[in-house]
Design a protein with these regions (language model features):
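An N-terminal, well-structured beta->alpha segment
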Residues: 1, 15-59
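N-terminal acidic, proline/glycine-rich, low-complexity intrinsically disordered segments
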Residues: 1-9
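Short, motif-level signal for alpha-helix interfacial/capping segments enriched in acidic residues
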Residues: 9-15, 130
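Glycine-rich phosphate-binding loops that contact phosphosugars or nucleotide phosphates
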Residues: 60-161
């Protein structure tokens, strides 16, 4: 068997960096992240309060997304389950292949898409409406299809990723 020819990009990059540049980069990333959190905090408004009240009455929660939004959705779903709100994650790409049966009338769906135009999410919007579930959109684009078709919308936009 041949030895792997893959290179460890992180290791190779770190070997070529000076200790101070590593520290500077880490601090820069943390500053960007903390700024984004502070800005998000400034956007908490009545819509957020309405979502909290709705979730407090919710019997079953489904969280959906694709890619990084999907990974975030998995964590959100897990956290809600941990605090006693029955929740599951539905991968938007898998939904149309038999998984839509997980959603029933009266359920709440949190759909996460930074653009609000993710194809897999947009295709599900009419289905959510037909099932008559409550839709909470989390998006960085308040003019998107997701924002316009959600019962509640949370602005999760960021300046820099």
């Amino acid at each position: 068997m041949k030895p792997s020819t893959k290179t460890n990009v992180l290791k190779d990059s770190a070997d070529n960096l000076h200790d101070q540049s590593i520290i500077d980069t880490a601090r820069k990333v943390l500053n960007i992240e903390s700024q984004a959190i502070a800005e998000l905090g400034n956007r908490i408004d009545d819509q957020f309060v309405n979502v909290v009240h709705h979730l407090n009455q919710c019997k079953h929660l489904v969280v959906t997304g694709v890619g990084k939004s999907g990974l975030i959705g998995k964590k959100i779903s897990s956290t809600f389950s941990s605090i006693g709100l029955p929740s599951l994650f539905l991968h938007a790409s898998e939904a149309s292949h038999g998984d839509l049966g997980m959603i029933s009338e009266g359920d709440t769906v949190i759909a996460i898409s930074n653009s609000g135009e993710t194809e897999e999410i947009v295709k599900l919007l009419p289905v959510f409406n037909r099932i008559q579930c409550t839709l909470v959109g989390m998006t960085g684009n308040m003019e998107s299809s997701l924002a316009k078709q959600s019962d509640y919308v949370l602005d999760v936009s960021v300046k820099e990723e």
